[in-house]
Amino acid sequence: MKSIVFVALFGLALLAVVCSASEDAHKELLKEVVRAVVVDKTDAVQAEERECRWYLGGCSQDGDCCKHLQCHSNYEWCIWDGTFSK
């Protein structure tokens, strides 16, 4: 009887240690994912600030849009300006 209780308590202690280690690994993985998402968003914002806006991209003035596009005054997105050239 004593040995069964001892084995059960030992099993519970071992399970607690394994779960704790698993939870720590899960937290570290979650931190890495959040860091990756934040870095990707930061890089995307910087890229948008450096580059022109493509067709239907948000804008506030014509200079925000790429070549042959203009900023639509009502909807504030880049639309084709009607010109053709190379």
Swiss-Prot record:
Tissue-wise expression: Expressed by the venom gland.
Disulfide bond positions: C52-C66, C59-C71, C65-C78
Record-level Gene Ontology MF annotations: ion channel inhibitor activity; toxin activity
Record key words, sorted: Disulfide bond, Ion channel impairing toxin, Knottin, Secreted, Signal, Toxin
Coiled-coil positions: none
Pfam families noted in UniProt: Toxin_12 (PF07740)
PROSITE patterns: HWTX_1
Propeptide stretches in the record: 22-50
SUPFAM superfamilies, per the entry: omega toxin-like (SSF57059)
Gene Ontology cellular component list: extracellular region
Signal peptide per UniProt: 1-21
Localisation: Secreted
Domain notes: The presence of a 'disulfide through disulfide knot' structurally defines this protein as a knottin.
Family according to the record: Belongs to the neurotoxin 10 (Hwtx-1) family. 17 (Hntx-9) subfamily.
Functional description taken from the UniProt entry: Ion channel inhibitor.
Protein name: Omega-theraphotoxin-Hhn1f 2
